[in-house]
């Protein structure tokens, strides 16, 4: 991502085993990296002759760690928060980091990777929950993975309505994209928490407040889905 152009952010941690860098990065202010990203966006827009009226769509988990900095640099940003079962999030993050890190490092422990990405995912979610309390409702929307998987048109209509955009001109392109990806669908990425020294109970306990606060459907330890609803 463009934030990484400042040698800042967890992209590098997902590719190399660099705990010293991770500790340094955690203590660095994020605003300079986001200001640099804003300048890069201006440069890209100018070079591609993009209309300033066309919004940028930026997606990276890094933003969850840096929401105050992001909103300082982009105060009018509209935020789309996507939600998924933490079991899948942590397992996927650990697997991604593991498969990238083993390319560049000779001695990598999968359990160390699992522990670090559980910690980092918890930090991302905690910071997001804290900042969400002060973000106006008109500036943020929540989209659930299961809802998108079950009825993507309705979910995308909600997003477009939130952004004040007409979805109709874009629907055909979305449908064609899904048709192409379905035709060339690869073997699903498989992983397990146990591979990375983690357990269902540990992850569930770590993110229980999150799943309750955002009505996230979590799978039970047996693999069955259970709706977790926020208490009144």
State where each predicted segment sits.
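Short, well-ordered alpha-helical microsegments
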Residues: 63-68, 152
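Extended catalytic-interface subdomain
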Residues: 1-19
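PAPS-dependent sulfotransferases, especially Golgi type II membrane carbohydrate sulfotransferases
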Residues: 17-34, 41, 45-48, 90-232
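Loop/turn-to-beta-strand initiation segments
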Residues: 51-55, 78
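Conserved phosphate-donor/acceptor-positioning beta-strand/loop module used by diverse small-molecule
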Residues: 59-60, 69-95
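Short His-Asn-centered micro-motif
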Residues: 57-61, 145
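Alpha-helical scaffolding segments of alpha/beta enzyme cores, especially the outer helices
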Residues: 39, 69-72, 130
């Amino acid at each position: 991502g463009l934030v990484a152009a400042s040698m800042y952010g967890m992209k590098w941690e997902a590719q190399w085993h660099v705990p010293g860098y991770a500790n340094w990065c955690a203590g660095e202010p994020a605003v300079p990296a986001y200001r640099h990203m804003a300048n890069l966006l201006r440069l890209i827009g100018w070079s591609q002759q993009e209309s300033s009226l066309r919004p940028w769509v930026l997606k990276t988990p890094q933003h969850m760690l840096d929401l105050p900095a992001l909103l300082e640099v982009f105060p009018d940003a509209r935020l789309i928060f996507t939600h998924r079962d933490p079991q899948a999030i942590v397992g996927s993050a650990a697997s991604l980091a593991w498969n990238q890190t083993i390319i560049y490092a000779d001695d990598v422990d999968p359990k160390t990777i699992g522990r670090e990405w559980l910690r980092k995912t918890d930090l991302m979610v905690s910071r997001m929950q804290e900042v969400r309390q002060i973000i106006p409702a008109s500036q943020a929307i929540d989209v659930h993975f299961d809802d998108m998987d079950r009825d993507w048109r309705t979910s995308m209509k909600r997003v477009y309505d939130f952004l004040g955009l007409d979805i109709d001109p874009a629907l055909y392109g979305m449908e064609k994209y899904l048709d192409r990806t379905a035709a060339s669908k690869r073997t699903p990425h498989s992983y397990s928490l146990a591979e990375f020294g983690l357990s269902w109970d540990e992850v569930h306990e770590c993110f229980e407040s999150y799943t309750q606060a955002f009505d996230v459907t979590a799978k039970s330890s047996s693999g069955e889905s259970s709706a977790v609803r926020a208490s009144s």
